[in-house]
Each structure stands twice: as C-alpha cells, then as structure tokens.
Design a protein with these regions (language model features):
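Broad phosphate/nucleotide-binding scaffolds in NTP-utilizing and phosphate-metabolizing enzymes
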Residues: 1-143
Length: 143
C-alpha cells in the first residue's frame, strides 16, 4: 500500500493529519500483508511505536468474496449431498465471522492489552504496550 494511502487512512481515522499525532512515520513499511501494513513511527511525546494500518476496502472485497462463496455453498448443497460430510454454509459463515473479528483492530488492541496483563506475571513473557487512545477499528498503535 502506498505511503500516501497510509497517511489518508490515519487522517480519516483520527480526523486530523497524521503529523498532528506522530512526530515521524517511516514511509518504508516494516511489514506488509493482505490485511494491513506496519510502519515504525515516533509519537509527538517521543515514544517509538509501530502503527498497523488496515488496507482500505479490505472488508468490502471480502464481503463480495463471501457473498459468492455463500451462493456456491447453497448451490453445492442442492447438487451434492455434502451435509453428511461438512456443513458448507456453516464453514462460509465461520470464515466470515473470523474475518470480521480479524479486521476490527479494536478487538486486536483489547486482546493485546489483555495478553500483556496476563504476561506480566511471568518474567520470561512480554507483550507490546498498546496505545488504546490511538487505536481505531482500522489502526493499532503499539510499542
């Protein structure tokens, strides 16, 4: 995803330009995958962070794909008696439910924070601190 798109997503999520929240964002991503891209950044307060930014339109694209899969599953269950082997409609719905939760970065932020609390009991475990006030449905900010 182009850096300009990252800045557009951040501005849309925060309701202000990214440079009002971050002192610096490295334009080169640390990593990139099908759902999101991660960039190294520095907050205005000086902390080094990682910003995970969801690709625009990823939910809409998946919704179209799932709609097609629903139609195929419906047709397949009429032609092939697969209900004795696997519930195709159920599999498609489970896929969609999982995808929806994975694309809500507020859920991811809460899970990270919960794991950090859990891991605090163990000296050999650690988890990045989440900056909850900077997390949205499409952005996660962590140390």
């Amino acid at each position: 995803m182009p850096y300009s798109t990252v800045l557009d997503v951040l501005a849309a999520e925060y309701g202000r330009p990214a440079d009002e929240v971050f002192a610096h964002i490295d334009p080169k991503p640390l990593g990139s995958a099908s759902l999101a891209q991660v960039h190294r950044a520095t907050l205005k307060t000086g902390e080094d962070v990682a910003i995970k930014v969801q690709r625009p339109g990823v939910r809409e694209t998946m919704a179209q794909d799932v709609s097609i899969m629903r139609s195929i599953a419906k047709a397949a269950t009429k032609v092939i008696r697969t209900s004795q082997i696997v519930d195709l409609k159920g599999v498609v719905e489970e896929l969609w439910d999982t995808f929806e939760s994975e694309t809500d970065f507020l859920i991811e932020a809460r899970n990270l924070a919960e794991f950090k609390r859990f891991a605090a009991r163990f000296k050999y475990m650690d988890c990045p601190t989440v900056y909850a006030e900077l997390c949205t449905e499409h952005v996660v900010v962590m140390e």
